[in-house]
């Protein structure tokens, strides 16, 4: 997540569009959470 925030900060500086980057982060976090769910399921945590 820290890496994602670093990338986002660079993107905001490049694009100057805060809103687009917030949307990108939201999408990234959703995918990340889905990945965690899959990992937990495969490891038997759920």
Swiss-Prot record:
Upregulating conditions: Repressed by estrogen.
List the residue ranges forming a coiled coil, or say none.
Answer: none
Q: Which UniProt keywords apply?
A: Glycoprotein, Pheromone-binding, Secreted, Transport
Give me the glycosylation sites of this protein: 15
Question: What organism does the UniProt record list as the source?
Answer: Rattus rattus
Q: Which GO terms describe its molecular function?
A: pheromone binding
Question: How would you summarize where this protein is expressed among tissues?
Answer: Found in many tissues including liver, urine, preputial gland, clitoral gland, submandibular gland and salivary gland.
General function of this protein: Binds pheromones that are released from drying urine of males. These pheromones affect the sexual behavior of females. Acts as a shuttle for pheromonal communication between individuals of the same species.
Name its cellular compartments.
Secreted
Assigned protein family: Belongs to the calycin superfamily. Lipocalin family.
Q: Which GO terms describe its cellular component?
A: extracellular region
Name it: Major urinary protein
């Amino acid at each position: 997540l820290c890496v994602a925030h670093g990338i986002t900060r660079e993107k905001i500086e490049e694009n100057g569009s805060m809103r687009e980057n917030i949307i990108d982060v939201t999408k990234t976090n959703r995918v990340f959470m889905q990945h965690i769910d899959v990992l937990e399921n495969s490891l038997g945590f759920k």
